[in-house]
């Protein structure tokens, strides 16, 4: 497997830290040892996050093609679009963002705070579109690309989550390689990795990266799309494409893609009581914030797996914190009392 042959444009600080979650582990009985890898602290570009790691492999292609405008898509409180806007500003490029109405939620300031506020401050051309949630290619995004061409620009297309893109899985192959190097320093290997999944390339890259040492099925995706069949298909497809691209010396099988469907409800972007309890518990035991759309759901999943005895006693579990905290501001009413 060879990731080094792909050009990478540095946008992150370097390897992200691994932090023991000692108080949360103790609160949950102390039989499972929890850790977090802090992708939410990976960059100085507008709070960073998992998409910034992915963009390191997309940006060299955009520059090589002479593109002048990054064009991406997400929901109103999209972390993806905020990170694309930050990278565009950092590189001196233009940025067009399609922000669809992916979440059935109304807060008085939902479309004026958090991620979308930062994207506007960063200078992006933010275009609100009423279309609902879907992780596939969108007509609104195609229209935005065409509008840039019609104005004489040269757009670079970045799909939702950087996912359905030939290079979208590479960043998290690198994540797995980074974890292996950190494990060598720590003196132990993690038994499981827990990660939130929606558009698929984060988990897909991890599956490929950890397949190299036989741990593909130890990556536990926690679905937050509430459309798990579509998410599972996309993870599997991206993983297979990425495996071929990096020269993994085995096929990706369906059994390699583990996706837990229990924690996504009631629907994309809306937390349930378990999500909210997990957000508060993590914050109050570790001082680590998670959001209601993504990380709160994967945190809920990990907590319940520990409570239910789904990890063998003594397991070391690595929680991949992908970012997303700026979206908390869009849910101010839910958290009005903390």
UniProtKB/Swiss-Prot annotation:
The modification N6-(pyridoxal phosphate)lysine is found at residue 51. Its cofactor is pyridoxal 5'-phosphate. InterPro entries: ACCD_DCysDesulf, ACP_carboxylate_deaminase, ACP_carboxylate_deaminase_bac, TrpB-like_PALP, TrpB-like_PALP_sf. Pfam families: PALP. Gene3D superfamilies: 3.40.50.1100. It comes from the Bacteria. SUPFAM superfamilies: Tryptophan synthase beta subunit-like PLP-dependent enzymes. Keywords: Hydrolase, Pyridoxal phosphate. The active site is at 78 (nucleophile). Belongs to the ACC deaminase/D-cysteine desulfhydrase family. Catalyzes a cyclopropane ring-opening reaction, the irreversible conversion of 1-aminocyclopropane-1-carboxylate (ACC) to ammonia and alpha-ketobutyrate. Allows growth on ACC as a nitrogen source. This is 1-aminocyclopropane-1-carboxylate deaminase. It comes from Pseudomonas sp. (strain ACP).
